[in-house]
A protein has these predicted regions:
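Short glycine/proline- and aromatic-enriched beta-strand/turn motifs that initiate or cap beta-hairpins
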Residues: 6-58, 64, 172, 176-180
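Residues that define the transmembrane beta-barrel architecture of outer-membrane proteins
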Residues: 15-17, 33-41, 72-80, 96, ...
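Extracellular loop and loop/strand-boundary signature of outer-membrane beta-barrel proteins
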Residues: 28-31, 66-73, 120-126, 158-162
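Gram-negative (and chloroplast) outer-membrane scaffold detector with strong preference
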Residues: 44-119, 148, 177-180
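Extended low-complexity acidic/polar segments
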Residues: 79, 88, 117-153
């Protein structure tokens, strides 16, 4: 009797690393550029521990646009992130994963790139500030190959110290390239 078994590569082993690129919509989740339009983009390094849990360290840019008299003015946040993601669901072949992450964030917020005077003579009262806080993330990942992982995530950021709101909801997609 001949048995043919399929070999699967080992995935999510302790010490494995990946570089991930993410992006998506923020806050109002509008596709159209206009008042309330927000987006984010980030790059991070993931390092796996036991049970497919992983550490994430990276940077992110978030921009939300506010309308005033037919013009759009950006509020931008540059943040660094350090967090831990707990894998709570995966299939037997280790192709699909679901993880819940908690991260610390710190960075800088700028409103209209530091320009407080608007073209009509009005003055912005919001200022540039250092910001700090955290994020709760739900991440779904699927291995396309042994080295390429597709990501879908939703997260809630809570940031203090800024003038443009404490809560920011994000929905995004990404790709992780396993490098080691």
């Amino acid at each position: 009797c001949l048995h043919v078994n399929r070999a699967h590569a080992q995935r999510c082993l302790p010490g494995m690393r990946g570089i991930q690129l993410t992006g998506g919509l923020s806050d109002n989740m509008r596709w159209k550029n206009g008042d309330g339009f927000g987006y984010h983009a980030g790059i991070a390094v993931s390092t796996y521990t036991k049970n497919a849990h992983h550490w994430v360290v990276g940077v992110e840019y978030l921009e939300k646009r506010y309308g005033y008299r037919d013009c759009l003015y950006p509020a931008s946040q540059f943040t660094g992130e350090g967090g831990y993601y707990l894998n709570f669901l995966s299939d037997r072949k280790k192709t699909f994963f679901a993880a819940l992450g908690l991260s610390a964030l710190a960075g800088y917020e700028t409103v209209n790139w530091g320009e407080s005077l608007l073209p009509d003579g009005s003055r912005l009262t919001d200022e540039d500030n250092f910001i700090y806080g955290g994020a709760l993330t739900l991440e779904l990942s699927a291995y396309v190959t042994d080295k390429i992982v597709l990501l879908v995530n939703g997260r809630q950021r809570v940031l203090f110290g800024g003038d443009c709101g404490k809560f920011h909801t994000q929905v995004g997609v990404g790709i992780r390239f396993m490098i080691r």
